[in-house]
Amino acid sequence: SISLTPAGELVLSYAEKILSLSDELDIRLSEMTGEMRGPLLVGASTTIAEFMLPKVLGEFNAMYPQVRARLIVANSESIENRVAEHTIDVGLIEAPAKQSGLSSHICCEDELRVICAPDYPLADMKSVTPKALEDYEFISREPGSGTREITDAYFRQHHVAPESLKTQMELGSPEALKGVVSTGLGFAIVSRAVVDKELQLGDLVSIPLKPPLTR
């Protein structure tokens, strides 16, 4: 085996420090010259991660090839908590941030719509009010979801208690919601972007809320 002398160990220790400082210097110089590099931890809610981020991350990677992006997927509440705890660099969520000390910016506006199976009683409606939805089976997102937070607030705003809805189950992803709704068990409320493929195939029907629900 090979072992270092005390002098060799001292030289190795300083060499490691020099290399570490060199890496840090590269990063700092890159920041000063506007060149981004290094790891980037991005947190995103389920809907955003599955249906909106893939194209954006591809474009980002092409613009900043020196940045190694890593995506963490969870519901909006969990992502917000991770940003507050500094375990991720940036979070993309569907509802306004609630914790103080966090800086938030609106990236885009999204419309939420009712979806149901083509043979479900709601399917032929041109639009539907929050009050009318009390008469139908509801497939909901789970607590902590940005979509759940927004829809609960929407119902309350229009004098419908979320607890009064005929909630059949609470599910943790848009894909799970679409799968259950397509069987005719009830309706769900999801981002318009989530159901493009199913609408084209005729597997689901999309109905605007009245008044519209945007976020």
Where are these regions (language model features)?
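Alpha-helical "hinge/linker" immediately C-terminal to small N-terminal DNA-binding modules
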Residues: 3-34
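Hydrophobic residues within well-ordered alpha-helices
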Residues: 5-8, 42, 83-84, 133, ...
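Short beta-strand and adjacent tight-turn residues that come in two discontinuous sequence segments
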Residues: 21, 74, 88-94, 172, ...
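Central regulatory/effector-binding core of bacterial HTH transcription factors
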Residues: 35-100
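A local structural motif
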Residues: 63-71, 159-168
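Alpha-to-beta junction loops
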Residues: 67, 79, 84-93, 112, ...
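Beta-alpha-beta core module
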Residues: 99-106, 110, 125, 132, ...
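Secondary-structure junction motif
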Residues: 122, 138-159
